[in-house]
Amino acid sequence: MKIGIISINMYSKYLNFACPLHTFAFQQFLLKKGYNNTVINYQPIYFNGFNMKHPYTYYKNCLKTLKKTNSLKINKIKDYEQKKKDFKKIYKEREIRYNKFQDFIDNNYIKTEKCYNSASLEVESLDYDCYICVTDVIWKNEPHEGFDRGFFLGSTCMENKLKISYAASRGVNFAKTEEETKEFFDYINDIDYISVREESLKRYIEENSNKKATVVLDPVLLHNEDFWSKYVRKPKETEYLFLYYVVEKASDTIEEAIKFAIKHNLTIIEVTDRPLKYGRIPKSSKVKYKYLYDIGLEEWLGYIKYASYIFTNSFHGCCFSIIFQKHFFVGKRNGDKVTHLLEMFNLQNRYFNNNIEVLSNNPSINYDNVSKILEEKKNISENFIINALNKKVTKEKDYSKDKKNQRYKMIYVNKKRNSITDKFNDIESYEVEEKQLNTGENLLLPNMFKSNKYIFSHWIIYILIDKDWFYYIKDKKIVNVKDYNNEELYEFSSNDLIPYFSVNGIKKVVAEAIWKDN
């Protein structure tokens, strides 16, 4: 069986340490069980050409574009200005951190050479027998983008193949409207075996559909300390408190870490995924501390393994604290994933946001009990994925109905190509008022453009799928404009049928007028 894994993996904009590690952990788990598999190099829909190595350059270019178009998106401009400023300050550190992440991925992943996105998975065949979408927050409703079809295994190349979700999570951004809720359940109804990371998502799925969901461990917890120790780089620092926070400002986590470190005469090693030059520990504080941004995955694991204490608001900070059996405390975090993890292992007393006394009492952790629970949960998780992979699924679903129900903007344009320099009269573009159904039954309009020097020859068609443009070529295939190699384009006459396009995610179809000498 050929297995393709789709996950966030290397495309975390803030270079979150967990993203490459949980994908790596799942791949290694399958290999250990005898299942060959490949990580699909997949860019999420929200990626938008982001420059992973130099985000400063990305935001700088975005701002130029926004200002050129006289955009009134004031809040977006302010946000980009701040991010540009922040990433400029850590320009060198970011490059170092990025290179370390890439080295780990290049040395440890089995992955596709080619990079795919939601649009390319509509027209290219990957030829896997089974597709598994793997944690982390892959089922979120991304603001301004929506759900990512690839993370739901809803791409055309995956049709009628075995589909499994492992430890999927939805995060804090989720379906808000009836339409978004329908879209979510349309996606998961086509997944054969569903497992999720949080109990709340399991309840949501089972209460609103006929699908069953199993709660499983995050992939990093499928491996023990011995496994992860092989990828640890031991830090030179000793007797330190490791402070690791993500996403939020984490003021409570930072404040309590400072108090604890002073009380116990410990140096703080501060690490975050935020683009900060000097961290968030105030210089005026009386604590000894060291802030690090330019570290890699092995160093991050090392700081956890050899820490005297850990303060974090991170889900995976908690996971690796459990794996390495560390004394750790947890600050406030939005969402329920951290809460669920602590409840799973009866470690609610690690939270200090509701019980500050935990810091003065400094309770120990009974890792014998934690280990028993971990083994039980491992068995459930392993059984889920192995049983799912061993089931034979014969699928002959017709996906054309949903594809034909897509509506797209139909636009006619009049561009100057080749040697045409004539000034065309009247309109230069025309958008059909009503969106077109993708049925293959709509007719192309007669040419509505005029020229004094040339006569109309034919139409060519290109299609916007998600955010990528594709040509419709002579052999009735769709080719990405970026990959176009002068293949002959299909020539349409007026009143020809607009083809049915057997893809998802159609946003626009453009018919361009082509002219010839009079």
Where are these regions (language model features)?
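Secondary-structure capping and domain/repeat boundary segments
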Residues: 402-518
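Active-site anion-handling motifs in enzyme catalytic cores
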Residues: 1-404
